[in-house]
Amino acid sequence: MKSFTFLILFLFAAQSISVYAGSFHKDVKIHWGDGRGKIHDNQGKLLSLSLDKSSGSGFQSNQEFLYGKAEVQMKLVPGNSAGTVTTFYLKSPGTTWDEIDFEFLGNISGHPYTLHTNVYTKGSGDKEQQFHLWFDPTANFHTYCITWNPQRIIFTVDGIPIREFMNAESRGVPFPTKQPMRLYASLWEAEHWATRGGLEKTDWSKAPFTAYYRNYNVEGCVWVNGKSVCPANSQWFTQKLDSNGQTRMKGVQSKYMVYNYCSDKKRFPRGVPPECS
């Protein structure tokens, strides 16, 4: 496969298959959960995922994308959510998959969620950054966005950049450029690791646990017949952080980041990965 397999089509027709303006009815499939995932309105704007002791639930986009901007508003499980993981992510199939993650790790009542971000290329991740958010993500809906283009991946929360992962393939750092991905969301149990490394277990007396998603929106290069078809006016395709964006991101990281693989010298005693320097 060529390194760039996308087509830029300067046609309005391309936009009709490359931009999704958010209907859970039209654009996603609840692909597991046996009824625990539900769409709540005729317009397809609000969806819930639930978890009980028998099963969690999840949905996936109907289309695959090679590059795109995906965002959704989420309201997380309130109260004692220890052992639960609520997600919004991009992923390709297979054993050498690519993946871009937002994962929200639950906690006991009165303690903050951990927002876990990661990037996988060809099945290899280990690029974790984690944050404690500056608001209660269970009280109201907040907007989470992944922008993925050939130069970088940008994670934003309520429009504020919290992480930028650059394409450093020229330095030998893998970057997802070749495999189309679907968008996924899920609510599932991971009590063996999710909360304080597995020390806090899921309190099933609080089940069912429910998270809400609304205003799903994807602007992406849709994978069609082996090519990625992009609209002509995709500003996200060349998006980067300006000086103000960099300043805002560094401010969030200095105040709210609780783990950065680039700073973990015990994990990398021979030196941190090259993208960290």
Curated annotation (Swiss-Prot):
Compartments, record wording: Secreted, Cell wall; Secreted, Extracellular space, Apoplast
Post-translational changes noted in the entry: Contains at least one intrachain disulfide bond essential for its enzymatic activity.
N-terminal signal peptide: 1-21
Gene Ontology molecular function, alphabetical: hydrolase activity, hydrolyzing O-glycosyl compounds; polysaccharide binding; xyloglucan:xyloglucosyl transferase activity
pH dependence: Optimum pH is 7.0.
EC number per UniProt: 2.4.1.207
GO cellular component: apoplast
Record: residues binding xyloglucan: 103, 116-118, 126-128, 192-193, 197, 267
Alphabetical UniProt keywords: Apoplast, Cell wall, Cell wall biogenesis/degradation, Disulfide bond, Glycoprotein, Glycosidase, Hydrolase, Secreted, Signal, Transferase
Major localization listed first in the record, in broad terms: secreted
Tissue expression from the record: Root specific.
Residue intervals passing through the bilayer: none
Pfam families in alphabetical order: Glyco_hydro_16, XET_C
Biological processes annotated in GO: cell division; cell wall biogenesis; cell wall organization; cellular response to auxin stimulus; xyloglucan metabolic process
Family that this chain belongs to: Belongs to the glycosyl hydrolase 16 family. XTH group 2 subfamily.
PANTHER family in alphabetical order: XYLOGLUCAN ENDOTRANSGLUCOSYLASE/HYDROLASE PROTEIN 8-RELATED
Annotated protein name in UniProt: Xyloglucan endotransglucosylase/hydrolase protein 19
Gene from which this protein is expressed: XTH19
